[in-house]
């Protein structure tokens, strides 16, 4: 696991790769999320991330349990957010609206992003604190 920022973590925003790593039972991701929940850190997951990762069935017990935790906020892509995501897509030249929503949400909340794809997120927001899994 690699961290790109030395600032203290105020909360975590998860991308699709983070949920897929949890689904696979990745011990580093499980430990990171367990510590975050124990410390009472807020966790956010954009709704598009859930849509990309969700396939249902018994394989996703860990993901379902995490999403059901009251400390985890699944952020909707409502009208205002969709417009902000569209503007940021235009400014950054990045066309993946889920990646852009992850970045926007983390930036708004002062969160660190847990990601398997730091290169794409760094294109959108070069200074965004990341934990690579």
Residue ranges and their predicted role:
Residues 58, 115-120:
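Short, polar loop motifs at secondary-structure junctions
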Residues 71-92:
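Acidic catalytic patch
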Residues 53, 96-112:
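Acidic, metal-associated active-site segment
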Residues 119-127:
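Short loop/helix-cap segments at secondary-structure boundaries that form the rim of catalytic
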Residues 1-45, 54-66, 131:
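Short, well-structured N-terminal submotif of metal-dependent ribonuclease cores
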Residues 18-19, 49, 81, 101-102, ...:
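Alpha-helix capping/helix-boundary segments
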């Amino acid at each position: 696991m690699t961290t790109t920022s030395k600032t203290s973590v105020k909360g975590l925003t998860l991308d699709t790769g983070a949920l897929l790593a949890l689904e696979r039972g990745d011990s580093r991701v499980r430990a990171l999320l367990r510590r975050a929940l124990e410390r009472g850190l807020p966790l956010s997951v954009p709704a598009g991330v859930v849509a990309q990762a969700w396939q249902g069935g018994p394989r996703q017990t860990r993901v379902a349990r995490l999403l059901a935790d009251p400390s985890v906020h699944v952020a909707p892509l409502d009208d205002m957010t969709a417009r902000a995501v569209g503007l940021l897509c235009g400014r950054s030249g990045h066309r993946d609206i889920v990646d852009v929503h992850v970045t926007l949400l983390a930036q708004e909340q002062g969160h660190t992003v847990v990601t398997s794809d730091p290169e794409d997120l760094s294109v959108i927001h070069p200074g965004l604190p990341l934990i690579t899994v």
